[in-house]
């Protein structure tokens, strides 16, 4: 037993010197030609599978593609590019890192105004909703560092309520348009109308992110009862000519003791920390810097913007153009003629240095299991769809194929 223990210690000591060479990555390194061949075959199978085709359709000889079909193809492609651009501009940092670092907290109180400015009389009788407006323009420059946003409002008891419980729903107010609804649903709650006061919280991260990206979209939030303009019997039937009113009361909005005090009452409201407010959790940029690089350099994203301009040896997205005719032998895809499918490649160094016990154990594991991957591998993180125009017989089709373009990579 003692001899086996001594042998194990000797092996671990020797592996201390070998860990440096083993700690880059155990993922198999392939040459470009082999990678392209594998990627081409994968794309061939992906496209046919996504189109539910067992074999490529017969190519159709077309002298020209109708304008309407080309317009549909171009508009679809542009819409996808726009959506990806907005997602990139408004996205947060990678989740694991953003969860780890401490957040700066910003509080924005509801903008106070006259009573009628915080009410929407949607129905002929009664008050069915409340509006809450906020100015968050001071943090617009740090919009990409938004981690989470919460809307908080204090429900206060309503002793004169005619019901014990009522359902409320929170909406983002949208700019009026005849083609879309004027509200976007965020969440709902069933609440007691009496009882003790309680704070209500709603996750409004996506809404606030949109406000920070486009200031003109900030039209406020609205709390409304579930079915305004109707009151229901216990069996679900509508009571005609009787309209439900909001009996849930909120601090800072329904304070009857402040009514009639004019500017003095509104000033008191502004200083009341129980008023409706937003809580924004922001990650300071310096906390996302790479601590190992002496300067204040922002951690780079391993995407096409960085990788295509730099000679990065470690994990990065690499350009790979697929020509439908030359690489796949396909003539049935009319648009595009080809596209950058890209791929991920490069070693992923361990997070810990090579002289730690952690790396030593992993090095031993790699030695005993050469086919396994104990260290991270370079894999796709963000993928974009591809829009194609093709014919089945003489019928044109425009299709969107999901996850066809590698835009960024990560070590996983």
From Swiss-Prot:
**Modified-residue entries (N5-methylglutamine), positions:** 293
Q: Which range is the signal sequence, renumbered to this chain?
A: 1-23
* GO cellular component assignments: collagen-containing extracellular matrix; extracellular region; extracellular space; intracellular membrane-bounded organelle; plasma membrane; platelet alpha granule lumen
Kindly state the positions of the motif Cell attachment site in this protein: 261-263
Q: Which residues are glycosylated?
A: 74, 135, 142
Provide the record's note on post-translational modification.
Transforming growth factor beta-3 proprotein: The precursor proprotein is cleaved in the Golgi apparatus to form Transforming growth factor beta-3 (TGF-beta-3) and Latency-associated peptide (LAP) chains, which remain non-covalently linked, rendering TGF-beta-3 inactive. Methylated at Gln-293 by N6AMT1.
Q: Name one GO biological process term.
A: positive regulation of filopodium assembly
Provide the GO MF annotations for this entry.
cytokine activity; growth factor activity; identical protein binding; transforming growth factor beta binding; type I transforming growth factor beta receptor binding; type II transforming growth factor beta receptor binding; type III transforming growth factor beta receptor binding
Note whether Cytoplasm occurs among the keywords. no
In the record, what disease is this protein associated with?
A: Arrhythmogenic right ventricular dysplasia, familial, 1: A congenital heart disease characterized by infiltration of adipose and fibrous tissue into the right ventricle and loss of myocardial cells, resulting in ventricular and supraventricular arrhythmias.
* Function noted in UniProt: Transforming growth factor beta-3 proprotein: Precursor of the Latency-associated peptide (LAP) and Transforming growth factor beta-3 (TGF-beta-3) chains, which constitute the regulatory and active subunit of TGF-beta-3, respectively. Transforming growth factor beta-3: Multifunctional protein that regulates embryogenesis and cell differentiation and is required in various processes such as secondary palate development. Activation into mature form follows different steps: following cleavage of the proprotein in the Golgi apparatus, Latency-associated peptide (LAP) and Transforming growth factor beta-3 (TGF-beta-3) chains remain non-covalently linked rendering TGF-beta-3 inactive during storage in extracellular matrix.
Known partners and oligomeric status: Interacts with ASPN. Latency-associated peptide: Homodimer; disulfide-linked. Latency-associated peptide: Interacts with Transforming growth factor beta-3 (TGF-beta-3) chain; interaction is non-covalent and maintains (TGF-beta-3) in a latent state. Latency-associated peptide: Interacts with LRRC32/GARP; leading to regulate activation of TGF-beta-3 and promote epithelial fusion during palate development. Latency-associated peptide: Interacts (via cell attachment site) with integrins, leading to release of the active TGF-beta-3. Transforming growth factor beta-3: Homodimer; disulfide-linked.
Protein name per its UniProtKB record:
Transforming growth factor beta-3 proprotein
